[in-house]
UniProtKB/Swiss-Prot annotation:
<dbReference type="InterPro" id="IPR036345">
    <property type="entry name" value="ExoRNase_PH_dom2_sf"/>
</dbReference>
<dbReference type="GO" id="GO:0006396">
    <property type="term" value="P:RNA processing"/>
</dbReference>
<keyword id="KW-0548">Nucleotidyltransferase</keyword>
<dbReference type="InterPro" id="IPR001247">
    <property type="entry name" value="ExoRNase_PH_dom1"/>
</dbReference>
<dbReference type="InterPro" id="IPR015847">
    <property type="entry name" value="ExoRNase_PH_dom2"/>
</dbReference>
<feature type="binding site">
    <location>
        <position position="498"/>
    </location>
    <ligand>
        <name>Mg(2+)</name>
    </ligand>
</feature>
<comment type="function">
    <text>Involved in mRNA degradation. Catalyzes the phosphorolysis of single-stranded polyribonucleotides processively in the 3'- to 5'-direction.</text>
</comment>
<dbReference type="InterPro" id="IPR004087">
    <property type="entry name" value="KH_dom"/>
</dbReference>
<dbReference type="InterPro" id="IPR015848">
    <property type="entry name" value="PNPase_PH_RNA-bd_bac/org-type"/>
</dbReference>
<keyword id="KW-0460">Magnesium</keyword>
<feature type="binding site">
    <location>
        <position position="504"/>
    </location>
    <ligand>
        <name>Mg(2+)</name>
    </ligand>
</feature>
<dbReference type="Pfam" id="PF00013">
    <property type="entry name" value="KH_1"/>
</dbReference>
<dbReference type="InterPro" id="IPR012162">
    <property type="entry name" value="PNPase"/>
</dbReference>
<dbReference type="Pfam" id="PF03725">
    <property type="entry name" value="RNase_PH_C"/>
</dbReference>
<dbReference type="GO" id="GO:0004654">
    <property type="term" value="F:polyribonucleotide nucleotidyltransferase activity"/>
</dbReference>
<dbReference type="InterPro" id="IPR012340">
    <property type="entry name" value="NA-bd_OB-fold"/>
</dbReference>
<keyword id="KW-0963">Cytoplasm</keyword>
Length: 713
């Protein structure tokens, strides 16, 4: 690295992680940001900046945005768009932004309402070490150095499982052979976020992997703490939003219990509960509001009471779970909601299913496509295609709301990716089922756990389509209520329980093991036993769901649906690929006139796609005829194409002809070939010899032994 003499000296903090240098650097770049850190891991480099607005905004939530920006120069490329510049973030960038957002969000102080923006920019990608795990580390370090109040640090690591051993931060090449792709983010005391894709890994191995990850991230946390001790700015002064004094909150809680809050909360239907709760809140707040001397309520305090009422509801829901083992819809902690399933629900879809669990309902569909339907991946520097696609749609009517449809949200991208990871482990190999497969999960109703319902609906739709998956997959969302060393694990959580719990995690898998895991922890460190128990309780629920799914459709259908395309595959010699294509693509165009699509790969693999099986078979026959090679001793029905004084040329199949010498046409002396054969005659001939130049000598099989074969000079 070269520069002028006055280049500022950066502050560097370094350690070795999985045999590669991890460097945190600050003080040289992006110095006007409140916090900025350059993180380098091997030759992958990201820059993270943290900035907060000077004044708070009117909101009842933390206005945090996290952006993950990929620059094509990071891999030495120019963007392929018309404008030749980066556009909207791709799916991988969105998932990386979510991976950074989720572990840092819970660590902002309650009530902090200043806008916070974290931008992680990938400056260099060595295409060996994925940049996504550097996002949480860099964002954490930038926040630690900034004046933004935040209770970090956090760190993130990736864990693989190769040959029965855990591998820390596996490279992209190592991930291809790994049975596990586990990303864990956490603080010193706790695991805060988990994202995992697994090849049917058992629960005990997962717990061990989580412990391994948490142990290995500790040096990264210590490095950030050392940096912050020396360089961190004083934290900005901020004023928490006004709230009711604790004694008034307590009085409101007692009054709510007296007026029957517990009974209102235990209304089975989501809609009825919401309406009853809104009416109850209105009556309760009207009664609880302080009154003036003339009896007029103090309306100025109403927003404070409305906010306090939300805390009252959360407190009572948690009490019901912890002390009475009761949930909002009347279930016990381990109970699943009622489930009903339908398959083959759409007449033209290649596969379809509806999976309904309580008030959550997903329509799953499968479409089978050709090689031309593969998705071109938008990953930074990766020129690959994807044959398995899973898309998740969450329309507003699914929750009884009205809002604009503004394209795919980050949440939809994240949930679709989770469902994809859950199903990917059981998908057939390309050579066994060479289709492009698109699964779509349309959420028709939602009251919690819609991503896991998408896994179930998607799996059933795959089986309905006749996709030979290795095993059925089901998923379930779990929750945890934790207080004073008491833990209650909740199976199949409602949307309401998702908000009140201390940890939510989604587990998908087969009877054999877990294929996908997503976890967000909102409390401190959880004992190993609690994590293990939660995973085992999820397994118990998963097996019950699989029983119900298999009762409807025990295995993939043996045949594809009538409207699904058929694929025929064959292999042609590489040197004959040009013959199949023809001059200027003439032969391929002629094949496509049959109503088929033809894909030809560099190794000579030819795939023929058509919804008309007969058309596909005809196309296959034509290709076989084009690429056939004559074999000595084989008999063919050939057509006379030319007559010469020394014999007749016979076409055995398109592109291949041989010579039937005049001496082999008939017994005795033949004066003129035309006396025995004419152009267009169809006769049986046998390949007698093929010389080193590929020239073919033919004989008539019925005269074999009666006429001595011709000898070449």
């Amino acid at each position: 690295m070269e520069g002028t003499p006055n280049v500022p000296q950066a502050h560097r903090y370094e350690l070795t992680l999985a045999g590669r240098p991890l460097v945190l650097e600050t003080g040289k770049y992006a110095k006007q940001a409140s916090g900025s850190v350059l993180v380098r891991y091997a030759d992958t480099v990201v820059l993270a900046t943290a900035q907060a607005s000077e004044t708070p905004v009117e909101a009842d939530f933390l206005p945090l945005t996290v952006e993950f920006e990929e620059r094509h120069y990071a891999v030495g490329k120019i963007p392929g768009s018309f404008m030749r510049r980066e556009g909207r973030p791709g799916e991988k960038a969105i998932l990386s932004a979510r991976m950074t957002d989720r572990p840092i969000r819970p660590l902002f102080p309650k009530g902090f309402r200043h806008e916070v923006q974290i931008i992680v920019t990938v400056l260099s990608a060595d295409q060996k070490n994925p940049p996504d795990i550097l996002g949480p580390i860099a964002a954490s370090a930038a926040l630690m150095l900034s004046d933004i109040p935040w209770e970090g640090p956090i760190a993130a690591v990736r864990v693989g499982l190769i040959g029965g051993s855990f591998v820390l931060n596996p490279t992209l090449q190592e991930l291809e052979e790994s049975q596990l792709d586990l990303v864990v983010a956490g603080s010193k005391e706790a695991i805060l976020m988990v994202e995992a894709e697994a090849g049917e890994v058992d629960e005990e191995t997962l717990v061990q992997a989580l412990e391994f990850a948490h142990k290995e991230m500790q040096p990264i946390l210590e490095l950030q703490e050392a940096m912050a001790r020396e360089l961190a700015k004083p934290k900005m002064a901020w004023t928490p939003p006004e709230s009711l004094p604790e004694e008034e909150k307590e009085a409101l809680y007692r009054l709510a219990l007296e007026r029957g809050l517990s009974q209102v909360l235990q209304t089975a239907s989501k809609g009825e509960r919401s309406r009853a709760l809104a009416e109850f809140a209105e009556r309760l707040i009207a009664e609880a509001l302080p009154k003036g001397e003339d009896g007029t309520p103090d309306e100025g305090k109403k927003p404070l009471y409305e906010s306090a009422f939300d805390e009252v509801v959360r407190r009572e829901l948690r009490r019901l779970v912890l002390e009475e083992g009761k949930r909002a819809d009347g279930r016990g902690p381990k109970d699943l909601r009622p489930i009903w399933i339908e398959v083959d629900v759409l007449p033209r879809a290649h596969g379809s299913a509806v999976f309904t669990r309580g008030e959550t309902q997903v329509l799953g569909t499968v479409t089978l496509g050709t090689g031309r339907d593969e998705q071109i991946l938008d990953d930074l520097g990766i020129d690959e295609t994807e044959k398995f696609l899973v898309h998740y749609n969450f329309p507003p009517f699914s929750t009884g709301e009205v809002r604009r449809l503004r394209g795919v949200s980050r949440r939809e991208v994240g949930h679709g990716n989770l469902a994809k990871r859950a199903l990917k482990a059981v998908m057939p190999k390309e050579e066994d089922f060479p289709y492009t497969i698109r699964v779509v999960g349309d959420v028709l109703e939602s009251n919690g756990s819609s991503s896991m319902a998408t896994v179930c609906a998607g799996c059933l739709a795959l089986m309905d389509a006749g996709v030979p998956i290795r095993a059925p997959v089901a998923g379930v969302a779990m929750g945890l209520v934790w207080e004073e060393n008491r833990a209650v694990i909740l199976t199949d959580i409602l949307g309401l329980e998702d908000a009140l719990g201390d940890m939510d995690f989604k587990v998908a898998g087969t009877r054999k093991g877990v294929t996908a895991l997503q976890m967000d922890n909102k409390v401190g460190g959880l004992p190993r036993e609690v994590l293990k128990e939660a995973l085992l309780q999820a397994r118990e629920a998963r097996l019950k769901i699989l029983d119900l799914m298999e009762a409807v459709l025990p295995a993939p259908r043996p045949e594809l649906k009538p409207f699904a395309p058929r694929i025929l595959s064959l292999k042609v010699p590489v040197e004959k690929i040009g013959l199949v294509i023809g001059p200027g693509g003439k032969n391929v165009r002629a094949l496509e006139e049959l109503g088929v699509e033809v894909d030809i790969e560099e190794d000579g693999t030819v795939r023929i796609y058509s919804s008309d099986l007969q058309a596909a078979l005809e196309a296959k026959k034509r290709i076989e005829d084009l690429t056939r090679e004559a074999k000595v001793g084989e008999i063919y029905e050939g057509t006379v194409t030319r007559i010469t004084p020394f014999g007749a040329f016979i076409s055995l199949f398109p592109g291949t002809e041989g010579l039937l010498h005049i001496s082999q046409i008939a017994p005795g002396r033949v004066a003129r070939v035309e006396d025995h054969l004419k152009v267009g005659d169809v006769i049986k001939v046998k390949v007698h010899r093929i010389d080193e130049r590929g020239k073919i000598d033919l004989i008539r099989p019925e005269l074999e032994g009666k006429i001595p074969p011709r000898r070449r000079r």
